[in-house]
Swiss-Prot record:
Subcellular location: Nucleus
Entry keyword set: Activator, Coiled coil, Nucleus, Transcription, Transcription regulation
GO molecular function: transcription coregulator activity
Entry annotated with the keyword Transcription regulation: yes
Sequence similarity: Belongs to the Mediator complex subunit 21 family.
Protein name per Swiss-Prot or TrEMBL: Mediator of RNA polymerase II transcription subunit 21
UniProt keyword Ubl conjugation, yes or no: no
Amino acid sequence: MTDRLTQLQICLDQMMEQFCGAVNYVDKNHGFEPSNDSEEQMSDPQAHIVEEKEFEKNIDELTTDIILKTRQIMALIDSLPGVDVSAQEQLHRIDSLQKQLIKMEKEKIDAIKRKDALQEKVRTLTQDFTIGINESKTEARLV
């Protein structure tokens, strides 16, 4: 899982792609409308003009996607630390987390020491067992 700032950057990149895609769609598929009543309606025989209903449906879908992405971005921004939190509260939280980290690091070191002691005990027992087997084989040959 990525951190919130990375998620926010990814969402902003995706939103920019959605904007570009929407503008490109409108540019490539719009109908030719005069800007005022005195202008003639222009046409381009090579243009791919989508039916108005389909065009409107696709525009609605594109805008819905952009709105959803905007909401996702807003939720990420709201979840960032520091929003509605004073600097003093943030420092207190950092101090608390540092103390927690130190405690957990000590627990980790203790666990590593216990593991090392157990490994040494197993090694010693294995060595003693191997020596015992070797000695019993030697005694059996002598008899």
